[in-house]
Amino acid sequence: VGSEMCIRDRYKGTAIGPVNVLKKSESLIKRVHVENVDEELKRLDKAKEKTLQQLARLYDKALKEVGKVNAEIFEVHQIMLEDEDYQDAIHNMICNENVNAEYAVSITGDNFADMFANMDDDYMRARSADVKDISNRLVSNLSGEEQPDWENTEPSIIVADDLTPSETVQMDKNKILAFVLVHGSANSHTACLLYTSPSPR
């Protein structure tokens, strides 16, 4: 938590308080040659099932906090995770290039995110962040790394480059005075969660 900031929002009013800057560590996913493709596909399937379970728990949490309509964000994530084109692209990369699942998921996620980002429709462009969120969670489960815990311990203004829906729903909204997102989109699922979260004031 850093210095104090004053935020004025034309929709919600003014927030004054300490600043909590959230920084994400960008880990490089290495390309590793694998001999046993079948084992790699099994790893992928196991990580996918774990990811689906996590998304189901996030849905339940969001359902209690922001209602069914906004909780459906995490049902959409489950559908996107199981999307045939997305899964086929990952499988094909593992099988055809003998690469590790983490690398295949990372590259496929980037490709699909770029595809959405270049679409003309604002809503579809905002889905780019959803693909990245899903892919990052899948990679974390493959590598055995825990997703970062963005627990805020005191009331503060949250400043971040961007937030994923899963990061947003895990925060204690009663300790958030305001959000400042550098690359946030008004059409993103994160924005939907922020706008419908209970006000701390």
Language-model segments: which ranges?
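Non-catalytic, soluble scaffold/interaction modules
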Residues: 3, 8-193, 197, 201
